[in-house]
Swiss-Prot record:
Keyword Signal attached: yes
Source organism (scientific name): Arabidopsis thaliana (Mouse-ear cress)
Function: May play a role in plant defense. Probably has no oxalate oxidase activity even if the active site is conserved.
Protein name per UniProt: Germin-like protein subfamily 1 member 15
Annotated keywords: Apoplast, Disulfide bond, Glycoprotein, Manganese, Metal-binding, Secreted, Signal
A molecular function GO annotation: manganese ion binding
Oligomer status and interactors: Oligomer (believed to be a pentamer but probably hexamer).
Amino acid sequence: MKVSMSLILITFWALVTIAKAYDPSPLQDFCVAIDDPKNGVFVNGKFCKDPKQAKAEDFFSSGLNQAGITNNKVKSNVTTVNVDQIPGLNTLGISLVRIDYAPYGQNPPHTHPRATEILVLVEGTLYVGFVSSNQDNNRLFAKVLNPGDVFVFPIGMIHFQVNIGKTPAVAFAGLSSQNAGVITIADTVFGSTPPINPDILAQAFQLDVNVVKDLEAKFKN
């Protein structure tokens, strides 16, 4: 009996853990997010409007036909369509981005703490990849993508995309969260507020402390 009860408890805990790993499933047709809490219901971090007052515009966005501006340090631009742009996405567990890359531009190493990403390339040539966890010996999974190719970045894995062509590239990606979140590794480590003690980073990255200070100066917000 003790063994059976232990198995039940382990199974229950596993199910609870899985349930918390992704956006909760909706318990209604939709839950259009609003900022005004008056007469609203709080779900998934957003207040929901009365469903009888929902309209088509709550489920609509435009502009993904427009190229993003890529004249920045990394030569790329991410245009996000999540619950902040389409309030009707609230509780639906999905969002979308358009990524524009200048020649030799990149979407630098980053991670989405709340979502798996599936990317399709529609223009140009990209070198993409992700690195697995310490438990899997930090293996690199990488491919060169051409238009029509698709690649998946598992939830939480550090990943990147680089335009290896001489012409602009365009990709679209779906994310398994209404608000996937993004942590850009270099910005986070070297550009935190307040900054991480450079001695800590020097030891962690096996760098001279002056090199770390220079990096922190480059990434300072």
